[in-house]
Structure formats: C-alpha cells, structure tokens
Amino acid sequence: MPVITINGPIGCGAVTIGQMVAEQLQLNFVDRLFFTEAARIVGTPVGTLIAKEQRVDRFRDRLGRFVQTMLERSAMSGVSGEPYFGRGIENLPPETYMDLTGEGGGVAQKLDDKTFIEAMNKVAHDLHAQGDAVIIGRGANHILANAAHTLHVGLLAPMEVRVKTLMDREHFEEEEAHIHVEELERAREDFLLKFWKAHPSEASHYHMMLNMGKMNTKTAAEVIAHAAGDLTS
C-alpha cells in the first residue's frame, strides 16, 4: 500500500510525473486534494480558493481566462468523479497559497490557521490510511513525514527550465511566465515557512530530490517507481 508524495515548484512537471508513476504502479492519482477536501471540511467553496490564483495581479486578466477554461474543462470531465480521485481535477492550475499567508484579501485569508491545518492533516492521513496513492501537493511530505510505507520526492529545476515549461504548456509570453514562476514560488515558500517552518528545497524533507534540469519526465517517473518498490518488497 505505498503512498508517494511529489512536491516541487511550478514548471518542474510534478503533475505529469505523478500521473506517469500512478499509471506504472497502478496507484490512485491525487492532485488538488488538499484544497478540495479542506475546503469541504471548513465549509468554503473550493472555487473560492482556486480563484485566488487570479491575485497574481500583473497579468490577472489572462490568468482569469485560463482559470475559467480549466474550471469548465474540469466540470465537463469530472462530473462523475469521486471527491478524492475525480478526473479533471488534476487540470486545475496550481494553488498559490497567497491568501493563507496573508498576501491576498479573499475568503481563504479569513480561514483560521488551526482549522485549516487540521483539515489538511485529516485529508492527508485519510489518504495514507487508504494507501495506493500518488499525492501531488505542497505540504504533504510534512504532514506524512514519519508515515510508514511512504516515499517523499522533491523536484527542482533551473528558472529557465520552469519558464520554458510554462511558455510551452500555457502559451505565456516569456515575461509573463517568469513573473508567474517567481510569484508562485515566493507564495509557496511563505506558506511552508508559516505552517511548517521549512523551506521547500530542503533535502532533509524528502527521501530523494530530482533535478528536472538534468532528466526528462519519463526518466524521473521510472526512478520514482523503482524507489517505491522498496516500500512493497
């Protein structure tokens, strides 16, 4: 019953790699789980949390159109999906955590920290109890730091690689992609520092770290799948 967490900044390919690993090992693929279920537990619409993506303001309108498109696609493809593993939810854009660290001004900022973290912990531990999952989510490796049969993987990549990934995937101009990468990473760092007093690139929080500037996604997925074999052998 292995559980694999994959964490990394936007543009490292965590979602793609996670999907590959899940397919290879026949595991459930879990992406926007924490915000989806945490929002349900605390009674906040998940759309409200996702919408804060638009608060990366310098190109808000373009991101707003992107968010709307992804939400429509998710609704179409995930209409009959399960709350944890619904198809289509993995296509939603990455969360910024800006409201949760006080950078934004929306509903998420008003959530009590203790309530939010308790919800995050419950969801993560429920998933771990079920087993057989690849979890894409910032903070999952901290919540399940000492959990049995769990492999924590960190991803990193040079700025130019991450910027190019966004340009190719989201059709951003280079300047837009660069701003997006920088602001989301800063928000991610602030979030982890606030709630876990940790930096996302600290190697001690993972079983392994992979430099996506040095390998492709297929190789990374194969390395992770091989390492996960130790959890079941």
Task: Label every PLM stretch briefly.
Residues 5-19:
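Glycine-rich phosphate-binding P-loop
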Residues 121, 217-225:
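Short, amphipathic alpha-helical "lid/cap" segments that border enzyme active or binding sites
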Residues 28-40:
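Short beta-strand-centered segment that lines the nucleotide-binding/catalytic pocket of NTP-utilizing
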